[in-house]
Amino acid sequence: MFNRRLLRHVRYAFQQVRSNHSLQERIDAIPIERYRNFSIVAHVDHGKSTLSDRLLELTNVIKPGGKQVLDKLEVERERGITIKAQTCSMFYQDPRTKLDYLLHLVDTPGHVDFRAEVSRSYASCGGALLLVDASQGVQAQTVANFYLAYSMDLKLIPVINKIDLDIADIDQAEEQVENMFELPKSDCIKVSAKTGLHVEQLLPAIVDRIPPPTGKVEKPLRALLVDSWYDSYLGVVLLVHIVDGQVKRGDKIITAANGLKYEVRECGIMYPDRVATNTLKSGQVGYLVPGMKESKDAKIGDTLMHLGKESITEVLPGFEEPKPMVFVGAFPADGAEFKALDDDISRLVLNDRSVSLQRETSNALGQGWRLGFLGSLHASVFTERLEKEYGSKLILTQPTVPFLIKFKDGEKKIITNPDDFPDLSLRRSNLESLEEPFVEAIMTLPQEYLGKVIQLCDDSHGVQKEITYLNMTGQVMLRYELPLSYLVDDFFGKLKSVSRGYASLDYEDVGYKQSDIVKLELLVNGKSVDALAQVMHRDQTEHIGKEWVKKFKKFIKSQLFEVVIQARANNKIIARETIKAKRKDVLSKLHASDISRRKKLLSKQKQGKKNMKTVGNIQINQDAFQSFLRR
């Protein structure tokens, strides 16, 4: 039995080696002039991942019927969104010339929170398929991703998807592509990624219209580090675009950013999973296993070079690491699980380098972490992965944005925890200004909902920048400048609500601007509950403060003494609720006529309750915080 199993393993390993060898031979036979690196530009849910599956089927990378092959995370498949950019190599034989082409597809996220993933992916591409849903037309993220691709000089091929739907308006979609992006209608390829209709027309178009990489294999190695992930067996795996030169197993390499030296233990292509090859050469997108132990050593946008050749190698421009813009406090639902949860969060952060992690302690909730994310969806996805992959339960505080504090002596400070927000006395003395991040939001919506959407933006302290009526489509595109704090407070949900789900949203940062902001605190018997503090615009504090005290009152149990719940902003109490004390019947054993004894006992009880209120420590259980923080 053992020998049979061993034989089966040996036979499988031999087949893998033979398969990898034939793959390498096929790659070696294709010159760089027949490489095509491309991506797919689209709005969320316009069919990127489905189209990727059809292309992989057509090139025999996967068997027909595979679903969302490049969406490898469970949460990606469940939500139907792409979170991590993935790459896959394909071989395509052009039926017109019988020549083999090596295609590298990078499937990118569509949601604005993962824009950094998109820009990194475009850096290794020569062109892109611009995907538009025939039933919805051009949407906000289509526009934003188009301009990003255009600014990076990508050759764009317009593709109209979902033409099989009854509500598809192909003519309108083509008009929008021509009017908004100045791409001729005649260039549009009309497909149905779901059924596979006309998808085969895309491969010749990719070969004909997208230029090959321009690198030279004889030059010194220059590899652009596009992404990284952590593997428990291999350590950090690097996704790289080989701009010039070539790299093979056993090569010594050095990083330009921090001068760290490594030996390449394995290199290869994604097909769609890792397949080891002898060499990666100029123009290819593949992976390297350098024996790197920590993800923080992999600086995205870094240049990898051959050791000893760094003096004659020009470093690539690279790109800026994204900065977290949404912060939440995270605490274990059970304080005893802190150590296990700390390990789980650390492991997950290894694979999501854009999350910032810092330990913090709350008087109310104990030990926890301050987590920084790219946006609200990013935060939601991270916590969902933590629950599903590790079974961890968290209490999350309300999301907040980073605030910039400028002092009169020229010092600047970024505040990510509302509890650190300066109090009124400091503000009067040493403070020059309080600033918050703003974004420019792009919204596309049907004209009939314009009034309600404008009202929502105005209520969110927005400033209108531009309004464009899209020709003959009944659609409007709005540009508004908004505080990011309103955007993370479920602005997208409110936008969907007032537009009945028809509006789409995209945004980009425009920097910090001065605002009239204050800290709103919840006090219980005069003590601030630090985990519940929030920074907001002054005109929000009164109605939110009243909501807070009413809501929190529901979750506090009656005590033997009076409990006072207050909301305080700018050192001023703006709302109050009182939970009356439980009353013990101290008169039950008295005779009805003993009036003096009756008065004495009631006076003693009153004084006792007063003393208890002064020194009493109210125990607020974790369920109360969870219920209060739940929307």
From Swiss-Prot:
Pfam families: EFG_C, GTP_EFTU, LepA_C. InterPro entries: EF-4, EFG_III/V, EFG_V-like, G_TR_CS, LepA_C_sf, LepA_CTD, LepA_IV, P-loop_NTPase. It is a peripheral membrane protein. GTP binds at residues 42-49, 107-111, 161-164. Its main location: mitochondrion. It is found in: Mitochondrion inner membrane. It catalyses: GTP + H2O = GDP + phosphate + H(+). It is an enzyme of class 3 (hydrolase). Its EC number is 3.6.5.-. Keywords: GTP-binding, Hydrolase, Membrane, Mitochondrion, Mitochondrion inner membrane, Nucleotide-binding, Protein biosynthesis, Transit peptide. One of its GO terms (molecular function) is GTPase activity. Belongs to the TRAFAC class translation factor GTPase superfamily. Classic translation factor GTPase family. LepA subfamily. Promotes mitochondrial protein synthesis. May act as a fidelity factor of the translation reaction, by catalyzing a one-codon backward translocation of tRNAs on improperly translocated ribosomes. Binds to mitochondrial ribosomes in a GTP-dependent manner. This is Translation factor GUF1, mitochondrial. It comes from Kluyveromyces lactis (strain ATCC 8585 / CBS 2359 / DSM 70799 / NBRC 1267 / NRRL Y-1140 / WM37) (Yeast). The lineage of its organism: Eukaryota, Fungi, Dikarya, Ascomycota, Saccharomycotina. The gene is GUF1.
